[in-house]
Amino acid sequence: MTFPMWFAVPPEVPSAWLSTGMGPGPLLAAARAWHALAAQYTEIATELASVLAAVQASSWQGPSADRFVVAHQPFRYWLTHAATVATAAAAAHETAAAGYTSALGGMPTLAELAANHAMHGALVTTNFFGVNTIPIALNEADYLRMWIQAATVMSHYQAVAHESVAATPSTPPAPQIVTSAASSAASSSFPDPTKLILQLLKDFLELLRYLAVELLPGPLGDLIAQVLDWFISFVSGPVFTFLAYLVLDPLIYFGPFAPLTSPVLLPAGLTGLAGLGAVSGPAGPMVERVHSDGPSRQSWPAATGVTLVGTNPAALVTTPAPAPTTSAAPTAPSTPGSSAAQGLYAVGGPDGEGFNPIAKTTALAGVTTDAAAPAAKLPGDQAQSSASKATRLRRRLRQHRFEFLADDGRLTMPNTPEMADVAAGNRGLDALGFAGTIPKSAPGSATGLTHLGGGFADVLSQPMLPHTWDGSD
């Protein structure tokens, strides 16, 4: 309240304020506390200075000792400054207490004011025919004097209190004693977001209070400052802090996951998992198969004929055997008691590539079918005898055979044009049937290596040459 405002207040109001208040006792107690704090600051600063001097004079020498002394020097200066501030605050409280005492002494008392009112009432009551006009005027003038005196005293007391508060310096925060590396390591941890928000809110309110005091002098600025002080104290209180943590913590920690709880936005959050459909599982083991079908081309010239011996001498027939189209294993002339002798196989394939030992039933069935094909054309007993001998041969065979390699995706065989298996003989037409044909005398192409078809441990012997090549060339 400024000086003109105190003249609008009756003297009874400020007199009652000063007379019924706490008096100068709390201000003097605060001044004594500030003096004690200043003495403690001074004592600690003196002790720290003696410790630093002892460190420099002791056996601890070197860069670490120098860093210790240098790190504590700002703190010692701060202790000295804090002692000065505490002394100034104590003096300010003493000045405010003195101003209060002076204001209380210069303020018209409530008894004087009450006596003036009583005198004025008596004079007015006994004022017959205007005999008390002058005493009443004097009484009113005295009351006006007390009014002006109360306003003047309160204005002076307000000025003294304001100057005392403004003259009190503020204490800065204590400097850090640890090194910058330790400070950065200590501050590297992520702060509490709710605490940070509360601190920002208090800083904003304090900024508003500072602007209100500086830009709005007078009653309006004081009113806004008091309201902001109440808000700052409420924000700093435990109730608002509890409510802030209760509201802000779920929003901070669980707010980013809120779209996942919505049935409308959940498909949009799971669209990133759609690419997992293109990821295939581990591939299964590769199963190697051995095809029973041989290559489509002829790998070795067919035998010129097969001699079949039966139980009936009249049924003995010598005919040239047609070259098989699917098997490259020709049959040799048979002897009594056996359908055919085991011949040579033309085995083709890439260098260094072995044959899979799991070629069991499929390869065996192909060879048996090719061996039994000519016997199927024989009449009667020869066909049965050949079939039974082929069966016995199949039983005696082992579970490993040399067979043609098929295209399994790892090897691509060169394609060669197919050639006719038989051609017309040069002797003319003798008898109808297979007797008038002979194997084609055209040279065959070398497609592999010759190999004996007997033992499992046989190795490749010599390269296969066309039958028209002379060994002397």
Curated annotation (Swiss-Prot):
Membrane topology recorded in Swiss-Prot or TrEMBL: Multi-pass membrane protein
Keyword Iron tagged: yes
Main localization of the protein described in the UniProt heading: membrane
UniProt note: phenotype after gene disruption: Deletion of the gene results in a strain severely attenuated in HIA. The ppe37 genes with frameshift mutations are incapable of complementing BCG's HIA defect, indicating that they are non-functional.
Function: Essential for efficient heme-iron acquisition (HIA). Binds iron. Strains with a functional PPE37 can utilize low concentrations of hemin very efficiently in broth and on agar plates. During infection, might interfere with the pro-inflammatory cytokine response in infected macrophages.
Miscellaneous field: Significant genetic variability exists in ppe37 genes across different M.tuberculosis strains, with more than 60% of sequences from completely sequenced M.tuberculosis genomes having mutations that result in altered PPE37 proteins. These altered PPE37 proteins are non-functional in HIA.
Protein name (Swiss-Prot/TrEMBL): PPE family protein PPE37
Source organism per UniProt: Mycobacterium tuberculosis (strain ATCC 25618 / H37Rv)
